[in-house]
Structure formats: structure tokens, C-alpha cells
């Protein structure tokens, strides 16, 4: 089994300056059309090659917002047994029922075989968490979701630059 670094944050003076500049400005949101948040959204959208990007205050807020787009009330959402507590909180905030499943010990990410075992009539959505810069087996997870008509929402808060099959 390989060793996985969970905490290796590199922050230099450039990041500290950008954070300080943003904190001292009056533009903490992108709605104004100016400022570092808008610049971040544009750069991040390009970096992950997506059509849109909305910066929020935390990973919890991002999950809460994303899950609010689906009617998960009284429905099960499959998530990994190892994640920050906010993953389950976001499900509960939206009325869903967290269904914890085991992980692949080599990646600390959801194990597709365990997902398959956990799917039942109440399952509505699968929420894989890409952890420590490692990607879940998205090919298998996407197939499971498609075959079972389940929604897929990915949590990449701990792996924003991670690639799966060459794609971020």
C-alpha cells in the first residue's frame, strides 16, 4: 500500500499577498464584476476546462449549493466512509440520507464495488470525494450511475488539480 500525504499545503508570499489584497478590498464576491474573486473564477474555470465557475466561501457551501439542485429529500446519497464531516452535513441540510460506503485503501476514495452493493430503491445520488490529490475511479462510478439512473456530484475540494484519464 502506498503512503498518501493528507496535509502538505504550500503557501508562499504570492498567495498571502493575494489573500490580503482581497480581504482589504470591498470586492469579496464576483457579482460586482471586478476584483480578485472574479479573476479567480475566470482562471479556475479555464484551469479545470468547464463552462462555468462560482466561487463560494467553503467546500461545505459548495456541496450544499450543488446538492440543492437535486430533490434528495428522504433519498439516500452514497458517499465515502472517509471524508470531512461537511460532506454528510450537506446531504442532511438538503434533507437527504447519507449512505456511507467503504473506500479503496489504495486511494482512500469510493470503491465502485461497494457503491454497487449499496444501491437500492431509495438511492438518488452518488457523491464521490476525490481525496489528497487522488481521483476516484470515475469511469466505473459514471457507468454505475448511468446504469442505475443516479445523479453524480463530485467533491474535488481536496483534489482541485487532479486529473482522471488526462482530464481535470
Name each model feature, range by range.
Residues 1-29:
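N-terminal "arm"/small-domain region of PLP-dependent enzymes with the aminotransferase-like
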Residues 8-11, 28-32, 100, 107, ...:
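Pocket-edge positions in alpha/beta enzyme catalytic cores
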Residues 14, 35, 39, 61, ...:
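Short alpha-helical
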Residues 27, 32, 158-166:
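Active-site region of PLP-dependent enzymes
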Residues 30-76, 90-94, 100-102, 167:
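Phosphate-binding glycine-rich loop
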Residues 44, 156-157:
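Active-site His/Glu-centered metal-binding helix of metallohydrolases
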Residues 68-156, 163:
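PLP-dependent aminotransferase-like
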